[in-house]
């Protein structure tokens, strides 16, 4: 473990308080003081990973460079910090039990009774120590998923209790994020739920060092004093986390003003280095003082759930930051698009994005949206399934392949312009078996994609089973849709474009997983630039 210190963030009273953003914001603040950080998520569900979960259950699946399908919180971690995360940074109960059971079957436990303590808790700790050994950061900030009191979280809480006992308070810090609700009828904030949450933690042997309190209004000194007294936490260690209505990228600034990073460093006996927060501060100011607004239609089957396309929305905002532009999202359910409605729904937008997804629900609505973008010169970005739908639309309406489709949607189609990757043919298991992670892509010069990337070789993250069918490549290129990017061996189509269009790009990969507010992805920056230009046509 060497010099690495551990910060554990738990949650109490309620779920969805923003532990992931708090972890990311703290990482951002510590990096601004010159410390190196790594971030890790412990998920208490029994799934191995979220790859087969419905977005309605879990939100988006965030893909790391090494191909791990992870919680969307890892997206916050990478966007807020300089960390390059891998599968080691995402741990689930399912992974832990799977490892322990496999060892038991191999006889590694020498006939002993395998139990939650010590075997499960030891494996949980081991996952943290692996990150410490391999990355050797100054800090590892670990988010413990779920809410204190949940039965699923108990082994993780026991593991971090043991770590505090073993390594001491100067090396292990506990941060508890909790809710201080305001009762409208009484007109005051109530600290009792937080007191009970801390009492629950104390019963598990964990004394929080820092309380981060979600409140609708900034906490008064009296409230902080009360929580300090009843929760056995220093008053200066009670942090007010007020609701922010503008942008999540203001959250590090809010925590900085509350001196969260200073409290962490002081409590752990670390040097309070000078903070260099200027780049982040400049980005936030630019985000809040935009000169213009564009409306972007996001056409996706899970559109009713904000978290289903979290990285898409954030990346579009990053593109807006690059051009002093506020991006308004027009969320379109493709099932509401038909030949009678699609023009009315889409006529006021300045750009159309169709994100990734699976299955046939809403496919025809997506194809109608793409047709509208193509025929009206509206900037279009298709991602993964969105790119595949663009290929299908072009085949049907330009090439005259009336039955054109993906074999995912219609296995017996006469013109399978999108088909299963050859490597997927013999795969029976669903979880973790797609083409996952970062792969190189060769970009053709003198294309729109090249003008955006300004590079011949790029690396992008993938999550798919289907691809452009190569035997149709010549027919498409001869009729106006070009192949702008392929795998280095030229076997897989990665990017398609329509050169005669204002801005029309479809990509097989997921560029949203590599965009940051301080470094917008070139495709999103280019898409928003084109949308701004389109908006000024009148």
Curated annotation (Swiss-Prot):
UTP binds at residues 15, 190-195, 226. The keyword Iron does not apply. L-glutamine binds at residues 56, 357, 385-388, 408, 465. It catalyses: UTP + L-glutamine + ATP + H2O = CTP + L-glutamate + ADP + phosphate + 2 H(+); L-glutamine + H2O = L-glutamate + NH4(+); UTP + NH4(+) + ATP = CTP + ADP + phosphate + 2 H(+). The keyword Ligase applies. Mg(2+) binds at residues 73, 143. CTP binds at residues 15, 150-152, 190-195, 226. GO terms for cellular component: cytosol. GO terms for biological process: 'de novo' CTP biosynthetic process; CTP biosynthetic process; pyrimidine nucleobase biosynthetic process. Residues 1-270 are annotated as: Amidoligase domain. Residues 295-537 form the Glutamine amidotransferase type-1 domain. PANTHER family: CTP SYNTHASE (PTHR11550), CTP SYNTHASE-RELATED (PTHR11550:SF0). Belongs to the CTP synthase family. This is CTP synthase. It comes from Leptospira interrogans serogroup Icterohaemorrhagiae serovar Lai (strain 56601). The lineage of its organism: Bacteria, Pseudomonadati, Spirochaetota, Spirochaetia, Leptospirales.
């Amino acid at each position: 473990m060497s010099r690495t210190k551990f910060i554990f963030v738990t949650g109490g009273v309620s779920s969805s308080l923003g532990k992931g953003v708090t972890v990311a914001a703290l990482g951002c603040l510590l990096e601004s003081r010159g410390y190196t950080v790594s971030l890790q998520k412990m998920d208490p569900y029994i799934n191995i990973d979220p790859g087969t979960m419905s977005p309605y259950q879990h939100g988006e699946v965030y893909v790391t460079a090494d191909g791990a399908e992870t919680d969307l919180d890892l997206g916050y971690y990478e966007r807020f910090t300089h960390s390059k995360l891998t599968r080691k940074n995402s741990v689930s109960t399912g992974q832990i039990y799977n490892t322990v059971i496999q060892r038991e079957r191999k006889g590694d436990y020498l006939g002993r009774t395998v139990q939650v303590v010590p075997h499960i808790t030891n494996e949980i700790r081991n996952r943290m120590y692996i990150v410490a050994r391999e990355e050797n950061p100054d800090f590892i900030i670990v988010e413990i998923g779920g809410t204190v009191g949940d039965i699923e979280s108990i082994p993780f809480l026991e593991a971090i209790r043991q770590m505090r006992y073993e390594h001491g308070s100067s090396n292990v810090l506990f941060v508890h994020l909790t809710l201080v609700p305001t009762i409208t009828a009484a007109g005051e904030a109530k600290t009792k739920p937080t007191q009970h949450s801390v009492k629950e933690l104390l019963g598990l042997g964990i004394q929080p060092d820092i309380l981060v309190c979600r409140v609708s209004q900034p906490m008064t000194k009296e409230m902080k004093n009360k929580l300090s007294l009843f929760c056995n936490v220093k008053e200066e260690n009670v942090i007010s986390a007020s609701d922010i209505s503008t942008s999540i990228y203001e959250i590090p600034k809010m925590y900085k003003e509350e001196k969260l990073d200073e409290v962490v460093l002081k409590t752990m006996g670390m040097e309070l280095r000078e903070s260099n927060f200027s780049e982040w501060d400049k980005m936030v100011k630019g985000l809040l003082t935009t000169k213009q607004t564009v409306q972007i239609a996001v056409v996706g089957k899970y559109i009713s759930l904000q978290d289903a396309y979290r990285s898409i929305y954030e990346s579009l905002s990053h593109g807006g930051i690059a051009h002093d532009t506020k991006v308004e999202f027009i969320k379109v359910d493709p099932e509401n698009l038909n030949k009678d409605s699609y023009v009315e729904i889409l006529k006021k937008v300045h750009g159309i994005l169709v994100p990734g997804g699976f299955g046939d629900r809403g496919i025809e609505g997506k194809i109608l949206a793409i047709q509208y973008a193509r025929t009206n010169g509206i900037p279009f970005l298709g991602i993964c399934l969105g790119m595949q739908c663009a290929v299908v639309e072009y085949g049907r309406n330009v090439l005259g392949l009336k039955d054109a489709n993906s074999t995912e949607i219609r296995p017996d189609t006469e013109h399978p312009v999108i088909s299963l990757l050859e490597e997927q043919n013999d795969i029976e298991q669903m979880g973790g078996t797609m083409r996952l992670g970062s792969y190189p892509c060769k970009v053709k010069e003198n294309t729109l994609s090249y003008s955006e990337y300004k590079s011949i070789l790029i690396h992008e993250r993938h999550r798919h089973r289907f691809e452009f069918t190569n035997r149709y490549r010549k027919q498409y290129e001869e009729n106006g849709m070009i192949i702008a990017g392929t795998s280095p061996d030229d076997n897989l189509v990665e990017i398609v474009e329509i050169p005669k269009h204002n801005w029309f790009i479809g990509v097989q990969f997921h560029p949203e997983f590599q965009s940051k507010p301080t470094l917008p992805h070139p495709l999103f920056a280019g898409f928003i630039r084109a949308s701004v230009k389109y908006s000024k046509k009148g």
